[in-house]
Regions:
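Short solvent-exposed beta->alpha transition segments
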Residues: 41-53, 68-122
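A broad structural signal for short, well-ordered beta-strand segments within beta-sheet-rich domains
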Residues: 1, 98-101, 148-151
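Short helix-adjacent coil turns
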Residues: 58, 62-69
Length: 164
């Protein structure tokens, strides 16, 4: 039982109005659930969708040179630190080299190590897509914001896929 449920449970057990208190307990637990969910790594499908959506939005920004949509999907602290123009300058080499890795949409990411939530509540996701001849490597960090994971850090690079 969570600390919130224990505290609310104590309140309910001492109360003279069990129905009203039960409603309060249900309401508190309903609002606590998203916060609890944000402290866990998403399901395999959810994590794959998060990684692909992040990297494909980043790829679109690089291909088009327009970082506005990518910027809008960042966590607030990241958005405040990096304007769309600064993002474009930061990833200038991707834009200049015309790096396009939209092929990742057809592949499952390989996580190394497994995704985890650190002590600060950040979702850390590192790995690669087994694309050939060039492999896409990523190191992403997300924070909970408005009930969903929002990007706070991104490192992406491409390299030649290892030959068997």
């Amino acid at each position: 039982m969570s600390a919130v449920a224990r505290r609310v449970g104590m309140f309910v057990s001492r109360s003279v109005c069990p129905r009203a208190c039960l409603a309060v307990l249900v309401a508190v637990l309903a609002f606590a659930q998203p916060a609890l969910a944000q402290s866990r790594v998403p399901s395999e499908r959810g994590l794959e969708a998060l990684v692909k959506a992040t990297l494909l939005t980043f790829n679109d920004a690089n291909v088009t040179g327009n970082f506005t949509v990518f910027h809008a999907k960042l966590a607030k602290p990241f958005r405040q630190q990096f304007t769309p123009e600064r993002l474009q300058e930061t990833f200038k080499s991707f834009v200049e080299q015309q790096i396009d890795f939209d092929a990742i949409a057809a592949y499952k990411p390989v996580y190394d190590p497994a995704a985890s939530v650190d002590g600060d509540g950040r979702l850390l996701v590192k790995g690669h897509f087994p694309t050939e001849p060039t492999r896409v490597l990523f190191d992403l960090a997300f924070i909970p914001s408005d009930g969903e994971w929002k990007l706070i850090s991104i490192h992406v690079k491409t390299e030649r896929a290892p030959q068997p």
